[in-house]
Structures are given as structure tokens and as C-alpha cells.
Amino acid sequence: MNLLIIGSGAREHTFAWKIFNSKQNVSLFISNSNPGTTKIAKSVSIDINNFSDVKRSIIKNSIQIVLIGPEIPLINGIYDFIKNDSDISYVNVIGPSKYGAQLEGSKEFAKKFMYRNNIPTASYRSYDISSIDDAILFLKNNEPPFVLKADGPAAGKGVIIVDNVNDAIHNLKEMLIDSRFGDSSNKVVIEEFLTGIEMSCFVLFDGINYKILPYAKDYKRIGEGDKGLNTGGMGSVSPVNFLDIDLKDKIEKQIVIPTINGLIKEKIDYVGFIFIGLINVDGFPKVIEYNVRMGDPEAQVVFPRIENDFMEI
């Protein structure tokens, strides 16, 4: 079979490496390859955000499976584009629909999904430019620290934690008035600050069944000692040393299963990775965020721990 990987980073290199080592007969193609992938996959030049360009490559290379690495094509609806085009609708897409991708594309959408499905998470409020005065009043009437999140995608940099009201108001204005993160901060979610240790849970979902992959812990902050602004990821480790059987059981029963049931109940087209950002609060897991694709750098430490043939999972 011919399989196209969309993306050109270390995550996609990890996908290619794992699939290359499959016992199944897979011809690998990868968009805009990096030096590490040229030895194991054929590079195809694609503008991954131009879906007509993706279509041409699918047809030209007789692609049967498309595995999407980064979030932006998913948020922009690449799944829907492929499935709604009669020329290429036969292609299996590993990734959710545009509607499902809002779990990552909109913090407010994700929070509402969690609330509807009784999934433990921090309390929150959301505001846009029309309600900025209410947001400022909310900050003044509550105790810091505050967590401010751009509603839309911001490459892992749209979360700001502030320790005082003045800084919170300053950052809020930068996001809503000055468009600090472009359209992604047209709306801002203000969350309860949770104290605990963060970790990541990865689930592979086929629309009905799921498998939990190895857990990981990533380090987002740019400075030494886990300080400074968030990045897309400075590094990652797996296994997670504080993850015991009791915590695993709680994560599956209280978070993974309700997430899966919610996707099915709400008829959300979703086949692919569910990346659940968690925080362990005194032995009780809560969801910080959903991502609708595999993590990077997490893929680099998770996939080497998978002993199974990935094409058989």
C-alpha cells in the first residue's frame, strides 16, 4: 500500500521510521522531507495547507492512506476535503474531521465538550473584545495566579500564566486588543490555576475502539528549572516515573472512556490520535487540553516504546 505522511518534522520522521520497520509492504511518501527521512521515504513537494496540491500528490502517487502530523491542516479541514472529493474519497485519513479538530482548534469548544461529558478539568470563563470589561472585572475580583489561553491554535505558545492582576490585565489586553496571537486570540479563555505535575496521554482511536499508547511527560518552558514562556516543546521523557497503576486506572475511567464515549455519542468523525494533556492534582487527573494529533517531541519517545507492528495496531 502507498502511505503519505503530511508534515516534515521530527514527529513525522518518527512515524516514517516506525512504519518503515513494519513487516507489511508499505511504500512511504512524506511531504517536504528532512535529511532524516530521505533514506526511508520518498519526498514529495507539497504545500500542506493547499489541499488541491495534496490531492494532486494523492492521485499522482496512488496514495491509499494519509497520516497527518501537524494540527493546522486538520483544523482547516483536510479530512473533510479528502472525504468529500469523489476523486479521492476512497483514501483512509488518519485524523479527525474539521468539526472534531475543534477540540484543539478552540479551547472553548474543548471545555464545553469536557463539561458535557463530565470530564474533570479546571473551571473557566471565556471572553472576547466585546466583553473585555467583564474579563477585567473578573480578574480584579479573583486571586492569582491566572491562566490565560488564546482560544485558537498558537503553536504551543498561546498559554500564559501570570502571578498578579496587573500582569493578567496587561496580557489580556495584548491578546484581545492587540491581537498578540492573531485571530487565535480573538477569544481568550481564563482558567483556574491547577497545582500539580503535568503529563500526556495518547490514544489511538478508530471511531469505535481505542488503544492507549505509552504515556510521556514533555517540558514546555523555555528556561532552565522549568521557567519562562511556553514553547511547542523543549523535550520529552517516557515512561513517566510518577504514573502508577491507580493513576492509570483513574485516567482511563474518568478521562479516556468519557472522551471516547463523547465522540461517539456526539457523532464526531474521528479516526486518529487523541493527545490528552493532563495534570495530576494530588492523585486526581484533570484535563488541561486536547490535541488532535500526535505530539512533537512526544512522538520521539513514545513510538520507540511501541513493540507492536504499527501497521497492525
Give the residues covered by each predicted segment.
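Internal nucleotide-binding/catalytic subdomain
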Residues: V159-F303
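ATP-binding N-terminal substructure of ATP-dependent carboxylate-amine bond-forming enzymes
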Residues: M1-P96
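Conserved, structured core segments of small domains
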Residues: D296, R305-I313
